[in-house]
Amino acid sequence: MSSGGKSGGKAASSSKTSKSRSAKADLTFPVGRVHRLLRKGNYAQRIGAGAPIYLAAVLEYLAVEILELSGNAARDNKKSRIVPRHLQLAIRNDEELNKLLGHVTIAQGGVLPNIHQNLLPRKSAKGAKGASQEL
């Protein structure tokens, strides 16, 4: 059956595989690339070790949030592909994303469907009374 001893030994523990900073932080966005871009962008003389991790996490969160809402908009329109119109609908219908991206123009996004209250037909009680009093 199985032996009770250690399966590796000294050789298995010394051959440790390296993990990227994205994998250590459990992120999909590349922490190393964000760090490089922060250094090359001359935003500051020095960049802390935690700054690119935090920035990559924030960017990943925003991307996931927008894509999730856009996917819901695409599914509501019975489409399987997200197009700029779905991005526009997702961003403009979400209060916080609309505030964050308020001055952003999305190409081919269109406008939100909106009809002013004064332009809608009035619901009057005359129609109901007139129909009930007819003989």
From Swiss-Prot:
Q: What does this protein do?
A: Core component of nucleosome which plays a central role in DNA double strand break (DSB) repair. Nucleosomes wrap and compact DNA into chromatin, limiting DNA accessibility to the cellular machineries which require DNA as a template. Histones thereby play a central role in transcription regulation, DNA repair, DNA replication and chromosomal stability. DNA accessibility is regulated via a complex set of post-translational modifications of histones, also called histone code, and nucleosome remodeling.
Superkingdom of this protein's organism:
Eukaryota
Q: List the disulfide bonds.
A: none
For this protein, the record's PANTHER family field holds:
HISTONE H2A
Q: Where in the cell is it found?
A: Nucleus; Chromosome
Q: What is known of its domains?
A: The [ST]-Q motif constitutes a recognition sequence for kinases from the PI3/PI4-kinase family.
Description of post-translational modifications: Phosphorylated to form H2AS128ph (gamma-H2A) in response to DNA double-strand breaks (DSBs) generated by exogenous genotoxic agents and by stalled replication forks. Phosphorylation is dependent on the DNA damage checkpoint kinases MEC1/ATR and TEL1/ATM, spreads on either side of a detected DSB site and may mark the surrounding chromatin for recruitment of proteins required for DNA damage signaling and repair. Gamma-H2A is removed from the DNA prior to the strand invasion-primer extension step of the repair process and subsequently dephosphorylated. Acetylated by ESA1 to form H2AK4ac and H2AK7ac.
Write out the residue ranges of the motif [ST]-Q motif.
132-133
Question: Residues where N5-methylglutamine occurs?
Answer: 108
Protein's GO biological process:
DNA repair; heterochromatin formation
Q: What else is known?
A: In contrast to vertebrates and insects, its C-terminus is not monoubiquitinated.
Its taxonomic placement starts with: Eukaryota, Fungi, Dikarya, Ascomycota, Saccharomycotina
**Cellular component terms per the entry's GO annotation:** nucleosome; nucleus
Cite the SMART domains for this sequence: H2A (SM00414)
This protein is called what?
Answer: Histone H2A
At what positions is N6-acetyllysine found? 6, 10
Is Secreted a UniProt keyword of this protein? Answer: no
Q: Where is this region: Disordered?
A: 1-24
**Would you identify the family this protein belongs to, as annotated?**
Belongs to the histone H2A family.
The molecular function terms in GO held by this entry are: DNA binding; protein heterodimerization activity; structural constituent of chromatin
Assembly mode: The nucleosome is a histone octamer containing two molecules each of H2A, H2B, H3 and H4 assembled in one H3-H4 heterotetramer and two H2A-H2B heterodimers. The octamer wraps approximately 147 bp of DNA.
Q: Which UniProt keywords are listed?
A: Acetylation, Chromosome, DNA damage, DNA repair, DNA-binding, Methylation, Nucleosome core, Nucleus, Phosphoprotein
- Where are the Phosphoserine residues found in this chain? 132
Which coarse location class applies to the principal site listed for this UniProt protein?
Answer: nucleus
